[in-house]
Amino acid sequence: MTSLKQQPPHLLRGIPLAVRKLKKAFGAREVLKDIDLHIPAGQFVAIVGRSGCGKSTLLRLLAGLDKPTQGQLLAGSAPLDDAREDTRLMFQEARLLPWKKIIDNVGLGLSGDWRAQALEALEAVGLAERANEWPAALSGGQKQRVALARALIHKPRLLLLDEPLGALDALTRIEMQQLIEKLWGQYGFTVLLVTHDVSEAVAIADRVILIEEGQIGLDLLVDLPRPRVRGSHRLAALEAEVLNRVLALPGSPPDPEPFSPLPTQLRWAN
């Protein structure tokens, strides 16, 4: 198995994504409506919006957990389905198996000599010394680091993050944001992060996309140097621009986003 540190240059580039005329309906309810989107290889994109707006549905379609009603999902010029081995998904819950040690959770599903790779992935997230402990010994933030290592061992070119930091305390959340940003800069994968936290979105993403009632309401480039200074005037101005757009929408309670059962071929961060 190729070491993470020995990947040839072409494996360090992310997947370019194209979404064309994408629609998703559940019965008579249309959740996504004619979404058109181009994401260059290696870009870090945050998707924000009110609950029920369709952002998690979009991520599920990109992850292959559901099928679009209409439209195309492309990796470059090829169907995105062709890139499933290069795609990993992280959820808000780490989904570690409690009866397997941490290193075995990282190598879950792999065959051959993978333990050195798993240790390397754990080192990348700062947990190599915890490799032979049980998941129960970890904090919530540490469990999410293991889930991230479980994604890294597969050398992803597309990393989909569905509110992975939502259950963490404020300080741990910032630390995880910084870790994800560091690893993204190191490995060059394309990232799509679904989050309710607008400040998180503008702090770590290249681009913030606001979904409004199933459509793209705002597509904002965050053209600021890294590392970004939290609390700076420029970051605050971008955050205010997104929040003002969100708060200008009618505030009626949304319906929850429907979902289909997880298919057996799901490739989350494992």
UniProtKB/Swiss-Prot annotation:
Segments forming a coiled coil: none
Molecular functions (GO terms): ATP binding; ATP hydrolysis activity
Gene Ontology CC terms: plasma membrane
Catalysed reactions, as listed in the record: ATP + H2O + aliphatic sulfonate-[sulfonate-binding protein]Side 1 = ADP + phosphate + aliphatic sulfonateSide 2 + [sulfonate-binding protein]Side 1
Recorded topology in the membrane: Peripheral membrane protein
Domain ABC transporter: 17-238
Family matches, as Pfam families: ABC_tran
Compartments (UniProt record): Cell inner membrane
Leading EC class: translocase
EC number: 7.6.2.14
Family recorded in the similarity comment: Belongs to the ABC transporter superfamily. Aliphatic sulfonates importer (TC 3.A.1.17.2) family.
Self-association state and partner proteins as the record states: The complex is composed of two ATP-binding proteins (SsuB), two transmembrane proteins (SsuC) and a solute-binding protein (SsuA).
NCBIfam families tied to this protein: PRK11247.1
Protein's name according to its UniProt entry: Aliphatic sulfonates import ATP-binding protein SsuB 3
